[in-house]
Protein backbone atom coordinates (compact mmCIF):
# COMPACT_ATOMS: atom_id res chain seq x y z
CA UNK A 1 0.00 0.00 0.00
CA UNK A 2 1.05 3.62 -0.61
CA UNK A 3 3.54 4.88 1.99
CA UNK A 4 4.64 8.35 0.87
CA UNK A 5 2.31 10.48 2.98
CA UNK A 6 2.09 12.58 6.12
CA UNK A 7 -0.79 12.60 8.61
CA UNK A 8 -2.18 15.82 10.06
CA UNK A 9 -4.88 15.66 12.74
CA UNK A 10 -6.95 18.80 13.35
CA UNK A 11 -8.78 18.83 16.68
CA UNK A 12 -11.32 21.51 17.63
CA UNK A 13 -12.29 20.52 21.16
CA UNK A 14 -11.08 17.27 22.69
CA UNK A 15 -10.82 17.00 26.46
CA UNK A 16 -7.40 16.77 28.13
CA UNK A 17 -7.45 12.97 28.18
CA UNK A 18 -8.13 12.68 24.45
CA UNK A 19 -5.65 15.45 23.65
CA UNK A 20 -2.96 13.43 25.42
CA UNK A 21 -3.93 10.30 23.47
CA UNK A 22 -3.78 12.17 20.16
CA UNK A 23 -0.43 13.71 21.04
CA UNK A 24 1.04 10.32 21.94
CA UNK A 25 -0.42 8.70 18.82
CA UNK A 26 1.03 11.43 16.60
CA UNK A 27 4.42 11.11 18.27
CA UNK A 28 4.53 7.36 17.59
CA UNK A 29 3.47 7.79 13.96
CA UNK A 30 5.40 10.98 13.12
CA UNK A 31 2.10 12.78 12.53
CA UNK A 32 1.28 16.45 13.12
CA UNK A 33 -1.33 17.42 15.70
CA UNK A 34 -3.14 20.76 15.52
CA UNK A 35 -5.35 21.69 18.46
CA UNK A 36 -7.48 24.81 18.28
CA UNK A 37 -10.50 25.02 20.54
CA UNK A 38 -13.40 26.51 18.60
CA UNK A 39 -16.97 25.95 17.53
CA UNK A 40 -17.15 23.26 14.84
CA UNK A 41 -16.14 24.72 11.48
CA UNK A 42 -15.24 22.01 8.98
CA UNK A 43 -13.89 24.47 6.42
CA UNK A 44 -11.61 26.25 8.87
CA UNK A 45 -10.29 22.96 10.25
CA UNK A 46 -9.42 21.73 6.74
CA UNK A 47 -7.73 25.02 5.87
CA UNK A 48 -5.72 24.85 9.10
CA UNK A 49 -4.52 21.39 8.16
CA UNK A 50 -3.50 22.61 4.70
CA UNK A 51 -1.34 25.35 6.25
CA UNK A 52 0.79 22.64 7.91
CA UNK A 53 0.83 20.27 4.93
CA UNK A 54 3.89 19.87 2.72
CA UNK A 55 2.62 17.41 0.09
CA UNK A 56 1.71 17.95 -3.56
CA UNK A 57 -1.75 16.47 -2.91
CA UNK A 58 -4.25 16.96 -0.08
CA UNK A 59 -6.49 14.18 1.17
CA UNK A 60 -9.36 15.33 3.38
CA UNK A 61 -10.56 12.38 5.45
CA UNK A 62 -13.22 12.49 8.17
CA UNK A 63 -12.57 10.89 11.53
CA UNK A 64 -15.60 8.64 10.95
CA UNK A 65 -14.19 6.98 7.80
CA UNK A 66 -13.13 3.33 8.08
CA UNK A 67 -10.57 1.95 5.61
CA UNK A 68 -11.52 -1.51 4.32
CA UNK A 69 -9.18 -2.10 1.37
CA UNK A 70 -5.48 -1.63 0.68
CA UNK A 71 -5.19 0.12 -2.67
CA UNK A 72 -7.69 2.92 -2.15
CA UNK A 73 -5.14 5.74 -1.91
CA UNK A 74 -3.15 4.71 -4.99
CA UNK A 75 -6.32 4.62 -7.07
CA UNK A 76 -7.48 8.04 -5.94
CA UNK A 77 -4.02 9.50 -6.43
CA UNK A 78 -3.79 8.09 -9.95
CA UNK A 79 -7.04 9.89 -10.83
CA UNK A 80 -5.96 13.15 -9.19
CA UNK A 81 -2.74 13.19 -11.24
CA UNK A 82 -4.68 13.69 -14.48
CA UNK A 83 -4.33 17.31 -15.66
CA UNK A 84 -8.10 17.83 -16.04
CA UNK A 85 -8.95 16.22 -12.68
CA UNK A 86 -10.44 18.30 -9.88
CA UNK A 87 -11.68 16.65 -6.69
CA UNK A 88 -11.56 12.85 -6.50
CA UNK A 89 -14.09 11.08 -4.30
CA UNK A 90 -14.81 7.51 -3.23
CA UNK A 91 -17.81 5.24 -2.90
CA UNK A 92 -18.84 5.29 0.77
CA UNK A 93 -21.03 2.59 2.30
CA UNK A 94 -22.80 2.49 5.63
CA UNK A 95 -20.79 0.46 8.18
CA UNK A 96 -20.82 -3.34 7.76
CA UNK A 97 -23.34 -2.95 4.96
CA UNK A 98 -23.72 -2.81 1.18
CA UNK A 99 -26.02 0.24 1.40
CA UNK A 100 -24.66 3.32 -0.36
CA UNK A 101 -24.01 6.49 1.66
CA UNK A 102 -22.15 8.42 -1.05
CA UNK A 103 -21.52 7.75 -4.72
CA UNK A 104 -21.26 11.29 -6.00
CA UNK A 105 -23.40 14.40 -5.50
CA UNK A 106 -26.08 15.53 -7.95
CA UNK A 107 -27.46 19.08 -7.87
CA UNK A 108 -31.18 18.81 -8.57
CA UNK A 109 -34.45 20.52 -7.65
CA UNK A 110 -34.12 19.83 -3.92
CA UNK A 111 -30.50 20.99 -3.85
CA UNK A 112 -27.29 18.93 -3.66
CA UNK A 113 -28.09 15.27 -2.90
CA UNK A 114 -26.07 12.06 -2.62
CA UNK A 115 -26.70 9.83 -5.63
CA UNK A 116 -28.20 6.41 -4.79
CA UNK A 117 -28.34 7.21 -1.06
CA UNK A 118 -29.56 4.12 0.79
CA UNK A 119 -29.56 1.93 -2.33
CA UNK A 120 -28.00 -1.54 -2.18
CA UNK A 121 -24.63 -1.64 -3.92
CA UNK A 122 -25.17 -5.31 -4.77
CA UNK A 123 -27.27 -4.05 -7.69
CA UNK A 124 -25.97 -2.18 -10.73
CA UNK A 125 -27.67 1.16 -11.47
CA UNK A 126 -27.97 3.60 -14.38
CA UNK A 127 -25.25 2.70 -16.90
CA UNK A 128 -23.01 1.29 -14.17
CA UNK A 129 -22.90 4.55 -12.22
CA UNK A 130 -22.02 2.63 -9.05
CA UNK A 131 -19.39 0.48 -10.76
CA UNK A 132 -17.38 2.67 -13.16
CA UNK A 133 -15.47 5.92 -12.81
CA UNK A 134 -17.83 8.86 -13.45
CA UNK A 135 -17.72 12.65 -13.35
CA UNK A 136 -20.04 14.44 -10.93
CA UNK A 137 -20.64 18.09 -10.19
CA UNK A 138 -19.46 17.43 -6.62
CA UNK A 139 -18.17 14.79 -4.21
CA UNK A 140 -18.20 14.67 -0.43
CA UNK A 141 -15.20 15.93 1.53
CA UNK A 142 -15.61 13.03 3.95
CA UNK A 143 -13.01 11.50 1.62
CA UNK A 144 -11.69 13.90 -1.02
CA UNK A 145 -8.32 14.04 -2.77
CA UNK A 146 -7.11 17.06 -4.73
CA UNK A 147 -3.84 18.39 -6.07
CA UNK A 148 -2.46 21.11 -3.79
CA UNK A 149 -1.97 23.76 -6.47
CA UNK A 150 -5.57 23.35 -7.68
CA UNK A 151 -6.88 23.63 -4.12
CA UNK A 152 -4.89 26.83 -3.60
CA UNK A 153 -5.88 28.17 -7.03
CA UNK A 154 -9.58 28.21 -6.09
CA UNK A 155 -9.00 29.55 -2.57
CA UNK A 156 -9.62 26.41 -0.52
CA UNK A 157 -12.71 25.91 1.64
CA UNK A 158 -15.11 28.79 2.34
CA UNK A 159 -15.01 29.26 6.12
CA UNK A 160 -18.43 30.94 6.09
CA UNK A 161 -19.83 27.50 5.18
CA UNK A 162 -19.08 26.05 8.60
CA UNK A 163 -20.89 22.71 8.46
CA UNK A 164 -22.73 21.94 5.21
CA UNK A 165 -22.12 22.47 1.49
CA UNK A 166 -18.47 23.47 1.97
CA UNK A 167 -17.42 20.47 -0.13
CA UNK A 168 -20.04 21.28 -2.78
CA UNK A 169 -18.80 24.87 -2.91
CA UNK A 170 -15.22 23.64 -3.34
CA UNK A 171 -16.29 21.35 -6.17
CA UNK A 172 -18.40 24.05 -7.83
CA UNK A 173 -15.32 26.30 -7.86
CA UNK A 174 -13.33 23.52 -9.51
CA UNK A 175 -16.02 23.06 -12.19
CA UNK A 176 -16.04 26.81 -12.82
CA UNK A 177 -12.24 26.69 -13.17
CA UNK A 178 -12.56 24.00 -15.86
CA UNK A 179 -11.76 20.87 -13.85
CA UNK A 180 -13.70 17.60 -13.62
CA UNK A 181 -14.69 16.06 -10.28
CA UNK A 182 -14.74 12.27 -10.19
CA UNK A 183 -15.96 9.32 -8.13
CA UNK A 184 -13.77 6.23 -8.18
CA UNK A 185 -16.12 3.29 -7.64
CA UNK A 186 -13.19 0.94 -7.16
CA UNK A 187 -12.43 2.81 -3.93
CA UNK A 188 -14.89 1.62 -1.28
CA UNK A 189 -14.80 2.79 2.34
CA UNK A 190 -17.19 2.74 5.31
CA UNK A 191 -18.61 6.04 6.54
CA UNK A 192 -19.97 6.25 10.08
CA UNK A 193 -21.82 9.38 8.97
CA UNK A 194 -22.07 12.38 11.36
CA UNK A 195 -20.89 10.27 14.29
CA UNK A 196 -18.96 13.25 15.65
CA UNK A 197 -21.04 16.33 14.79
CA UNK A 198 -24.57 14.88 14.60
CA UNK A 199 -27.43 15.16 12.10
CA UNK A 200 -27.88 18.44 10.17
CA UNK A 201 -31.67 18.11 10.44
CA UNK A 202 -31.84 17.19 14.14
CA UNK A 203 -33.56 20.39 15.28
CA UNK A 204 -34.88 23.77 14.10
CA UNK A 205 -31.60 25.58 14.74
CA UNK A 206 -29.62 23.12 12.64
CA UNK A 207 -32.22 23.20 9.86
CA UNK A 208 -32.08 27.00 9.74
CA UNK A 209 -28.28 26.90 9.56
CA UNK A 210 -28.49 24.30 6.77
CA UNK A 211 -30.86 26.49 4.74
CA UNK A 212 -28.65 29.56 5.26
CA UNK A 213 -25.63 27.68 4.00
CA UNK A 214 -27.51 26.42 0.94
CA UNK A 215 -28.62 29.98 0.21
CA UNK A 216 -24.99 31.16 0.42
CA UNK A 217 -23.90 28.34 -1.90
CA UNK A 218 -26.38 29.36 -4.60
CA UNK A 219 -25.68 33.06 -4.11
CA UNK A 220 -22.01 32.36 -4.87
CA UNK A 221 -22.73 30.07 -7.82
CA UNK A 222 -25.82 31.48 -9.54
CA UNK A 223 -25.25 29.53 -12.77
CA UNK A 224 -25.18 26.26 -10.83
CA UNK A 225 -28.25 27.00 -8.69
CA UNK A 226 -30.25 23.76 -8.92
CA UNK A 227 -28.49 23.01 -12.21
CA UNK A 228 -26.10 20.12 -12.79
CA UNK A 229 -24.06 20.01 -16.03
CA UNK A 230 -23.28 16.33 -15.38
CA UNK A 231 -26.93 15.28 -14.94
CA UNK A 232 -29.12 14.73 -18.01
CA UNK A 233 -32.00 17.21 -18.20
CA UNK A 234 -34.33 14.39 -19.31
CA UNK A 235 -33.91 12.64 -15.96
CA UNK A 236 -36.19 13.36 -13.03
CA UNK A 237 -35.17 16.48 -11.11
CA UNK A 238 -36.47 15.43 -7.70
CA UNK A 239 -35.04 11.95 -7.12
CA UNK A 240 -31.59 10.44 -6.62
CA UNK A 241 -31.71 7.33 -8.79
CA UNK A 242 -31.35 8.66 -12.38
CA UNK A 243 -34.82 7.68 -13.63
CA UNK A 244 -36.41 9.21 -16.73
CA UNK A 245 -38.49 12.31 -16.24
CA UNK A 246 -42.15 11.26 -16.39
CA UNK A 247 -43.13 13.70 -19.14
CA UNK A 248 -40.08 12.77 -21.23
CA UNK A 249 -40.64 9.03 -20.79
CA UNK A 250 -44.30 9.44 -21.84
CA UNK A 251 -43.22 11.28 -25.01
CA UNK A 252 -40.62 8.59 -25.68
CA UNK A 253 -43.17 5.79 -25.23
CA UNK A 254 -45.63 7.52 -27.55
CA UNK A 255 -42.92 7.90 -30.22
CA UNK A 256 -42.01 4.21 -29.91
CA UNK A 257 -45.68 3.20 -30.13
CA UNK A 258 -46.07 5.37 -33.23
CA UNK A 259 -43.06 3.71 -34.87
CA UNK A 260 -44.31 0.23 -33.92
CA UNK A 261 -47.66 0.98 -35.51
CA UNK A 262 -46.00 2.40 -38.63
CA UNK A 263 -43.82 -0.69 -39.07
CA UNK A 264 -46.65 -3.04 -38.02
CA UNK A 265 -44.70 -4.43 -35.07
CA UNK A 266 -46.31 -6.06 -32.04
CA UNK A 267 -45.13 -6.11 -28.45
CA UNK A 268 -45.33 -4.31 -25.14
CA UNK A 269 -43.51 -1.20 -23.95
CA UNK A 270 -42.37 -1.44 -20.34
Where are the regions a protein language model picked out?
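Glycine-rich, basic loop-to-helix element that forms the pyrophosphate-binding segment
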Residues: 36-53
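Active-site donor/metal-binding and catalytic loop motifs
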Residues: 69, 177-179, 184-202, 216-217
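Short aromatic/hydrophobic "clamp" motif used to bind/position activated sugar donors
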Residues: 58
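Active-site acidic Asp-centered loop
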Residues: 12, 61-63, 158
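C-terminal, non-catalytic tails of nucleotide-sugar-dependent glycosyltransferases
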Residues: 86, 96-97, 108-136, 145, ...
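A short, conserved alpha-helix in the catalytic core of glycosyltransferases
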Residues: 72-76, 135-155, 160-190
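Acidic donor-binding segment of Leloir-type glycosyltransferases
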Residues: 1-38
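Conserved donor NDP-sugar-binding/catalytic core segment of glycosyltransferases
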Residues: 65-110
